[in-house]
Amino acid sequence: PKGLVGSEMCIRDRPSGANIFFEMAKDYTKMVEEMSGGELKIDLQPVGAVVKTSEIGQAVSSGALDMGHWVTAYWYGKNPAASLFGTGPSYGLSSQEVMGWMEYGGGRALYEETLSKVGYDYVGFFHMPMPAQPFGWFKKNVTKVADVKGMKYRTVGLATNVLTAMGMVVRQLPGGEIQPAMKTGLIDAAEFNNPT
């Protein structure tokens, strides 16, 4: 940022989950500081330090946070189109196809329109598209559709409607809450974008 010469800027950021994604966020903040010659620093906050995962968009929009990293599917309840910009269920576009659609097929314009309809006031940077979600991890074997009826299952986005129609009890939880929810019995099974 050549326009920042002689001044230092610190931006507060909050990623939406722990594990490998937090490690990638730490690497990103380090690269930004190095590339700006130390003039731009990102104060990376751990999960829950400022707001809950489900509140990141509102926190950035209101100015409580300068930036945040989260999955648009987490605001599926505000507008179902939000799920088009994250990982889909275990069918659909590959990561490369999603990026192609975003950049060359009208996806970015639809994203901006959806963002406006939801009422968020920020600029989104689309990155790290994940492949289609695996069906998940289960406490018991699933060998036929009847096995999932009544099962408490964690997912987000478009899969919510599909799996509810199959008879599952869907809970939309952030990634960082999956493991505790499995241990306490809040859910019987879960999907997450990859096995990290």
Features from the language model and the residues they span:
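Single conserved hydrophobic/aromatic residue that forms the stacking wall/gate
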Residues: P1-I11
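Alpha-helical hinge/cap motifs
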Residues: S7, G37-G38, K149-K152, G167, ...
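Short helix-initiation/N-cap motifs at beta->coil->alpha
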Residues: L44-Q58, V156-L158, V170-T184
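Periplasmic binding protein-like
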Residues: T53-Y74, P180-T196
